């Protein structure tokens, strides 16, 4: 029985399986769980794991020529020569890995340790994540499949095979979302006097109030379209709420009418809160917009009988396709493309669970979709907008305990930040430490008569950003302000176009980066005249210059007066604005030029050190790992004995736990109150450890199609801090999930141990 790659299946288990008539992976894949439970020493968890892994192996071996596991030596150069590490077997599918991440987010909605309204928020986030999955990843796969593309990813699955694989997984996730809503969240909320009322639950006075609301707030806005040759099926906006209405009777012109479409404008709230006079004291009563429309839609069709109506929502391809080599003005070209996003190719359709088959078939036909792209839902078709109630409910006991982010001494509004940074570099850890010092630095730069220039990159910064206000203020004060605005930040394009225009009108020099490359690095450079010299002050970060997300995402930011580092950043800005070549950088590693090769060399150095018996260890904390060459380098390092710890929030295509290949690699994902967003790289380097922070994940796009910045952390206090933080994340036994060989994740459980939750420890340690 070739089960060597199945974690937990050794020679003894193989012999026992053979005694029970299971001699091959195929037979194990087809085994019934009850059959395995009869085997001594095999519990439910192990049985499920063995069957799942066997099924995966059977599927993979039909697609790729997997090297026989029996021929793989445990370690050494000969092993590397005989193993084809480019085989698809060694890579987890990227799309399936992303769906696994969304499953982990959804699990937070079921975690009883999390406050109830935060659990509701996690449910909504999982829905929003699924929307983006379909708009981008699934849409891209569908497009490639329809074009007949056969080029496989690192896992050797073609677009067609990947689509088939994600179909069942995605349907299961959506079904679980609505099960949690209806069977878990709504009953728990009702027990806390927070109710989402169905039409059958409305009292007489509530119904009167809602009818008046419909007549005054909705009726004048809604515009139903009766379907006939003169009124064809309308264009449906991406992710909009729509109703298909079944009618009987004749319209005002005496014609038979049987179907109509009603689109709910996005300006309308999806949830309406009943006034306090219509609820009992201390209660919160909400009604879905769809319920109100369902109840009173007849008022839109006088003289025609409304037989029924069913909500539906279409998700479309939201990628924008620009031939950047052929356009003269990127901003204007993007403006022209933005409107088309609402009408991209259809990817999926969600319909009410009770929608009849004939109407479903009609809708599928209108959008050119198949049954595989159909998702029946028992509830509102857009769960993500349920989060609107969060701010309407004044129940601190059902939310996370608020905290006050702190600032290191010398960085407050009453201090001269330049003098503070001149004395020492400062590492900020958001959201535990405030983002305010970064904003204050730009403000002081605008007011300081010795500051002559400010250069900054902006990828996402949000509406009404104090960063932007500070830059505008500096420009008005006569400073030379240059801003590299990345117009192509997905789903923020419109905001960034508006931002760029506003900055230009104020006299800021605005550039849009490099054609073909997104500017994703987070860089701020301030040039200050001190005596006869210009001095550099820099800020480099792992996250965006976005004050709102700085309160929700974990990120690091470095404030430094290191002149070599500042000169590196200056050169990068010259490269971005003038398109000219620059000399070799001193300390900064930059994608798409030096970062990928530098990482490969550092991993190879650890591999060599392990073979020489020297201390060798790698810790990588990123959002995603999918770049094949980096994964292969990590495999080779593991085979040489390097201990590798990966803290990867989302996608991870590396397959850990393969005997002789990746058994020295552990992959964990931490999902908690804050979105883990920081990128940190650690290399043991034979006892001379190196730490880096960066804007780049281990993805092909970050290495080759984006401008990224990776910067060293050198001062001992900051090095010690990063070491302690990484150690804490590796000890987390509460919010951490461990990646299994088969691509699934198992949550850590502190059995008999003290609970260690990294984010909570950092909150207690760093905040007020």
What are these regions (language model features)?
Residues 643-647:
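Hydrophobic alpha/beta core scaffold segments
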Residues 1-68:
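Compact, charge-rich alpha-helical regulatory domains located at protein termini
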Residues 65-618, 636, 640, 652-768:
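N-terminal localization/anchoring segments of enzymes in phospholipid and broader phosphate metabolism
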Residues 17-18, 484, 649:
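Hydrophobic, well-ordered secondary-structure scaffolds
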Residues 628-631, 635:
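Glycine/threonine-rich ATP-lid/beta-loop region of ATP-binding domains
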């Amino acid at each position: 029985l070739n089960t060597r790659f199945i974690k937990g299946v050794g020679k003894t288990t193989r012999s026992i399986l053979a005694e029970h008539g299971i001699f091959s992976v195929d037979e194990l894949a087809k085994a019934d769980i009850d059959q395995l439970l009869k085997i001594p020493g095999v519990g439910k968890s192990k049985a499920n794991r063995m069957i799942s892994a066997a099924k995966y192996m059977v599927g993979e071996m039909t697609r790729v020529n997997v090297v026989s596991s029996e021929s793989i030596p445990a370690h050494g150069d000969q092993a590397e020569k005989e193993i084809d590490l480019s085989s698809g077997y060694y890579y987890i599918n990227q799309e399936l890995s992303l769906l696994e991440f969304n499953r982990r987010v959804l699990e937070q909605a079921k975690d009883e340790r999390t406050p109830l309204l935060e659990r509701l928020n996690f449910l909504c986030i999982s829905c929003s994540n699924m929307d983006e999955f379909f708009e981008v990843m699934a849409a891209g796969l569908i497009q490639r499949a329809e074009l007949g593309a056969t080029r496989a990813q690192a896992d050797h699955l073609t677009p067609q095979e990947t689509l088939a694989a994600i179909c069942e997984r995605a349907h299961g996730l959506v079904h679980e979302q609505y099960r949690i809503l209806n069977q878990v969240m709504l009953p728990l909320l009702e027990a806390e006097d927070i109710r989402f009322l169905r039409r059958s639950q409305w009292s007489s006075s509530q119904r009167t109030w809602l009818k008046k609301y419909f007549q005054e707030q909705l009726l004048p806005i809604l515009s139903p379209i009766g379907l006939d040759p003169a009124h064809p099926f309308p264009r449906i906006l991406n992710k909009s709420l729509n109703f298909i209405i079944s009618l009987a009777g004749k319209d005002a012109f005496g014609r038979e009418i049987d179907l109509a479409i009603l689109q709910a404008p996005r300006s309308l709230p999806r949830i309406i809160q009943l006034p306090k006079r219509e609820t009992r004291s201390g209660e919160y009563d909400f009604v879905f917009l769809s319920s109100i429309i369902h109840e009173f839609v007849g008022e839109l069709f006088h003289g025609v009988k409304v037989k029924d109506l069913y909500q539906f929502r279409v998700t479309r391809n939201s990628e924008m396709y620009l031939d950047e080599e052929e356009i003269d003005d990127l901003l204007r070209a993007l403006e022209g493309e933005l409107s088309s996003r609402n009408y991209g190719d259809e990817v999926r359709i969600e319909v009410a669970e009770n929608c009849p088959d004939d109407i479903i078939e009609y809708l599928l036909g209108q959008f050119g979709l198949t049954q595989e792209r159909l998702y029946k839902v028992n509830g509102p078709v857009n769960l993500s907008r349920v989060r609107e109630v969060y701010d309407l409910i004044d129940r601190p006991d059902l939310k996370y305990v608020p905290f006050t982010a702190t600032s290191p001494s010398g960085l407050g509004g009453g201090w001269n930040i330049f003098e503070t940074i001149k004395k020492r570099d400062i590492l900020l850890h958001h959201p535990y430490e405030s983002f305010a010092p970064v904003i204050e630095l730009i403000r002081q730069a605008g007011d300081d008569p010795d500051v002559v220039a400010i250069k900054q990159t902006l990828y996402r910064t949000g509406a009404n950003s104090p960063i932007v206000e500070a830059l505008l203020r500096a420009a008005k004060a006569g400073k030379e302000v240059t801003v590299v605005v990345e117009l192509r930040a997905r789903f923020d394009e419109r905001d960034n176009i508006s931002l760029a225009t506003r900055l230009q009108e104020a006299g800021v020099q605005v550039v849009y980066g490099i054609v073909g490359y997104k500017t994703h690095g987070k860089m701020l450079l301030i040039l200050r005249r001190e005596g006869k010299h210009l001095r550099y002050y820099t800020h480099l970060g792992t996250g965006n210059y976005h004050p709102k997300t700085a309160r929700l995402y974990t990120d690091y930011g470095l404030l430094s007066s290191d002149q070599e580092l500042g000169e590196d950043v200056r050169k990068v800005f010259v490269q971005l604005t003038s398109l000219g070549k620059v000399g070799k950088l001193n300390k900064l590693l930059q994608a798409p030029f030096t970062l990928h090769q530098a990482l490969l060399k550092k991993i190879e150095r650890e591999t060599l050190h392990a073979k020489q018996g020297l201390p060798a260890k790698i810790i990588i904390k990123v959002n995603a790992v999918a770049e094949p060459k980096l994964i292969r380098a990590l495999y080779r390092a593991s085979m040489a004995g390097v201990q590798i710890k990966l803290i990867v929030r989302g996608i991870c295509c590396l397959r850990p736990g393969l005997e002789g290949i990746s058994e020295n690699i552990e992959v964990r994902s931490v999902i908690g109150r804050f979105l883990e967003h920081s990128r940190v790289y650690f290399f043991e380097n034979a006892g001379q450890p190196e730490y880096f922070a960066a804007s780049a994940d281990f993805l092909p796009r970050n290495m080759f199609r984006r401008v990224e910045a990776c910067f060293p952390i050198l001062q001992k206090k900051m090095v010690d801090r990063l070491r302690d933080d990484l150690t804490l994340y590796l000890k987390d036994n509460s919010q951490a999930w461990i990646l299994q060989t088969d691509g699934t994740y198992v949550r850590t459980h502190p059995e008999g141990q003290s609970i260690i939750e990294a984010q909570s420890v950092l909150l207690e340690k760093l905040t007020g």
